Amino acid sequence: MVKITIMGASGTIGKTVAFNLAEKDVIDEIIMFSRPASHERVKGEILDMYDALAAEDIDCELKASSDYADLAGSSIVLITSGVPRKEGMSRLDLAVPNSKIVQEYSKQIAIHAPDSVILIVTNPVDVMTSIALKTSGFDKKRVIGLGNHLDSLRLKTLLSKHFHINSREIHTRVIGEHGDHMVPLLSSTTIGGILLKSFVEYMDLDVPKLVETLKNSGNNIISKKGATEYGPSYAISNLILTIANDTRKILTVSTYLEGEVEGVYDVSLGVPVILCKHGIKRIVPLKMNDEERTEFFDAARTVKKTTYELEKMLNKE
């Protein structure tokens, strides 16, 4: 039996992920966890979802809960709760208020679902991944951040439009911070197995503009509709289904590093990993050119500094 708990299920991301997963008809039970004040609203969301699922003859158990005891038996616990990002805010602006939420939930997960995989979506996700890891006491392979998986999908879309190629043919990756210090690995990006730079259209590619557009993708959506929704939700569902089905895909997620990539340690960053039913099977080696390596080190310094400062602040309270 596969049981998923979504903490923050009353929010846009949480409820959309719940419906995405239910539609796939591979999850047996989904606990939609929220604060008591949102409990009735979540019940309403579930009733609405059941009507939609009935049209497809899908039978998935959905339950609204505000009781931590309902986490018991969860294979994966998703944390989406937090202060939402608004236009003009960096993800790091959210660190202080959101860290307290992640701390509280991580403690409860450790008590009620000690064998689960924790998946962090709350921003700044790289910092929150470290907070969840240290608070829960879990093995680092079982604490994962959404991180650059979403950024990699966004880059894939941008390249698909520029090169007029089906996105399935594009293999690219973004690593580092899920934020201003993300690192697109264009030097190793391929289309149909051929290096990006080999295509004549590459001559017309304004790389600095591409990277800037990529970094501003989330903010651009927020400025127009108030929040990101479908992209993050489907990226999250992709990660959850990969873990739940043990399909061993290589995806880029935020994980705590201890020297595995370029000697970077004591910080959570986005790197490619093989995902399995137990979380991260292993980190996958990757190639970077000198410029990308420098940017990766910059990302490590930035995220590590923020994490240290935040931990110091939390320890004083």
Swiss-Prot record:
Residue numbers annotated as active site: 178 (proton acceptor)
Reactions catalysed: (S)-malate + NADP(+) = oxaloacetate + NADPH + H(+); (S)-malate + NAD(+) = oxaloacetate + NADH + H(+)
Residues in coiled coil: none
A single MF term (Gene Ontology): L-malate dehydrogenase (NADP+) activity
Residues engaged in binding NADP(+): 8-14, 98, 121-123
Pfam family of the protein (one): Ldh_1_C
EC class (word): oxidoreductase
Function summary: Catalyzes the reversible oxidation of malate to oxaloacetate.
Family from the record: Belongs to the LDH/MDH superfamily.
NCBIfam families: PRK06223.1
Protein name as it appears in the record: Malate dehydrogenase
Gene: mdh
